[in-house]
Curated annotation (Swiss-Prot):
Gene3D superfamilies: 1.10.287.3980. One of its GO terms (molecular function) is structural constituent of ribosome. Keywords: Ribonucleoprotein, Ribosomal protein. This is Large ribosomal subunit protein bL34. It comes from Corynebacterium jeikeium (strain K411). One of its GO terms (biological process) is translation.
């Protein structure tokens, strides 16, 4: 029985573009995410 390939193929540029700070700040919901993580005291706000 053949298994598929691994689904996580790390790529720093894509990671930043999809989950990065500038991307988060573009939308209201994204700003809410960053704000919630600030309030919670997260060491890292975004990827």
């Amino acid at each position: 029985m053949a298994k598929g390939k691994r689904t996580f193929q790390p790529n720093n540029r894509r990671r930043a573009r999809v989950h990065g700070f500038r991307t988060r700040m573009r939308t209201r919901a994204g700003r809410a995410i960053v704000s919630a993580r600030r309030n919670k005291g997260r060491k890292s706000l975004t990827a």
